Amino acid sequence: MNTVNIRPLPGERRVNYSAGWFVPVDEVTGMPPALPLRVFLDIHDGQGWVPTGIEPAITLSGAITYPGLGRCHNPAAAAPTRYRARFESEAYLAVGRAHQDGEEFLAYPFDGTTPPAVAASRVTVSLAPAVGYPFPGHLPVLYGQVSTAAGEPVPDVLVSATVGPPVLRTPQTAQTLTGPGGAFALPLRWAPAGPAITVTATDYRHVPNRTGQLSVQLPGALGRNQQIVIR
């Protein structure tokens, strides 16, 4: 159970439970994000999502939490509340956006003596690099755009490339997401020069899913803006 102690009165100890527990990870570095990341919390009012304006608490390890969500006077008579955390940044794109706008979770009712019926689960939020990410100079990055056959740019499309045997003994996969204008930046740190690499774009938000592929070779493909059409 994730707990956070906040401002107890003298001689008292007040325990709060965190309904949300998110650990953001920069997929380029494998570390907590070093660049600015904004988090917005929405509540579902039965009709749709409404911004709450509630700011998260950040733990010493960099986890994003929402202590106090679900606290009420009579937990036995209260129902869980549905929330959603959205992650936005100029440098990052939350990979989960390939499927939905944010990470949804339930805040179960609790008070000072009754804990939530269900403990919060730790959720890793993978942050793929956006086009504006400051990549190190030695890292090969494939830039491009995903669009429909009609030329309309498509945001929130998962772009990935996998290379395995016989080129690489252990299969490696790189992934990123398209931004609002359909543009993407796909880092390929393990990709060898010469062999063809297949880059796949998948729009999971469209029903049915739309996909497109592109075959590239390094290093020649790095100096061009690649175009992937999904159908």
How should each PLM-predicted stretch be described?
Residues R13-V15, A76-P80, F135-G137, L177-G179, ...:
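Surface-exposed coil/turn segments at beta-strand junctions on protein surfaces, enriched
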Residues A19, P36-R38, R82, V141, ...:
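Exposed beta-strand and adjacent loop surfaces of beta-rich binding modules
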Residues T29-Q47, A149-V167:
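Short, ordered, surface-exposed loop/turn motifs in non-cytosolic proteins
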Residues A91-V123, D203-Q227:
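Structured interaction patches on ligand/partner-binding surfaces of diverse proteins
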Residues P155-R231:
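Structured core of small recognition/catalytic domains
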